[in-house]
Every structure is written in structure tokens, then in C-alpha cells.
């Protein structure tokens, strides 16, 4: 260094057998800047690239692009002053037959003293706590700006799931959020349940855009073909939102949460679902150590 990583391209298998089919959650991506001992980036490979159920999906956005067939691309700018170390830990049960990558970077004479470093952290609650907001990011101390959210949602209850407000608590705000949204589908740029109507049924429409998207919906395990059971799954939804044009700045600390609120025929109600997420942000070092990543079995989708 000094330098900036401008582009990362990765492709790999998504399963090694019918029984070992969550490669994208078993591979753990980590990034270290300037000799630090604790990673600034730690997430399952698929989730980092907004593919959170062990299955790739088409994404055409400004920061993350996923194209056929399983071409994982990041255009997130990643500066470093001395050196950058990127590792991939294989926690999968088997060797991965195919894994290819390319990292494109430039070296510079210097980077400004105020340069902030890229961070990303993964979390999951396999069953959210009733009446308690799901935490997307917490313990972020220092100055920086928040640039994005990815959420993988497996709904475990009936009816509409997306009324929970996304909240940002900035620089000491605790009792009330500094920024409070109007619902999860609104935060990801949609409205009115993403709905269209076909044959008397309401269908959610998926989409992918430069700054926000709902690229993945499925009720089926597309990775498994078994003659003795069907492929039904709890409904799975993947969303991303990039704060490129609307970054969320903080000087001291940041916390990001989302309510667990749905609505049915009798009105609003508190939900319990299976949520996992990746938070993406820049900050000056040092950063707080992330919570320990769960064992691979506890990362697998339902």
C-alpha cells in the first residue's frame, strides 16, 4: 500500500452433493486492513454478495452484481494504507471442486489521513424475540458512514411481514431513533406489498436496481432433488439497500435495527421470523471486535 481495491470477482460451486448444499454459507469471507488482528469484514460468502440462502440470484446494482452463472462481483471501494489481507475459510464438509477469483486494485503514492476503512458484519436470529427489534448493526464506535444493508428473511408466520420500521440510532440517541422509516418494504424502495394480482392472488414482484432491490423470492429448495420428499421451504426473501447517494454519517457511534411487525386481517401484530443480515459501512480504525460467527450448522437456511 497505500492502495484501493476497486473490484472483486469470485465464482464457486453452490453444493458438493445433495446432502451438502450450502457452500455459500459454509465459506467465510474475511478482510483485514493494515495488519489488524481482528477482521474488518466477516460474513458468509453468499451473504456478502446479497445471496443469503445458499443459492445465487441475479443482482444488477451499483455495489454488488451477481450474474450467470454464479459470478459474484463487488465494486465496493476498499482502501488500505499499508496492506490488505483477504481470506476465505472453507467450513464446508467437503473440498470445493471449483473456486476462482480476481481482485483488481490500484496502488497510490498516498491516501488522505482522514481515509475511512470498509467494514461488513453478518448477524442472524433464527427466531427473533417477540416484541424486540432485530439488530442489524451495533457496537459501531468512532466516525464514519453507513453504506448498505442486506437482509435475508424467512417468514415463519402468516400474513404480511413488512411493517417493521428500520431505525438508525446515531451519536448517543438511545430512547428514540435519529432516523426512523415507515416499514421494511418502504426502506427497500417498494410500496403496497410489492403487489400485483393474478387470478385472484396477490403476488410479490421482485426487482433489482442500482441502489435497492428485492432480487430473491422462493418457497422451494432449488438445491435439492429427492424422490422421497418435496422441496417446500418457509418463504425466503432477499433485499438490499445501498446508501450511496444518501449515506448515513456518524461521528461517535451507530446502531441499526428493524422492528418485527406484520399486518393481517385484524391489523398490526408483532412477529417472530428468521432474519439474517449484512451491514456495510466505513469508519476510521480501530473498530470494535465483531460478535463470534455462529457455527456453520447454525448459519444454514431453513
Located regions from the model:
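Beta-strand-centric surfaces of beta-sandwich/beta-rich domains
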Residues: 1-302
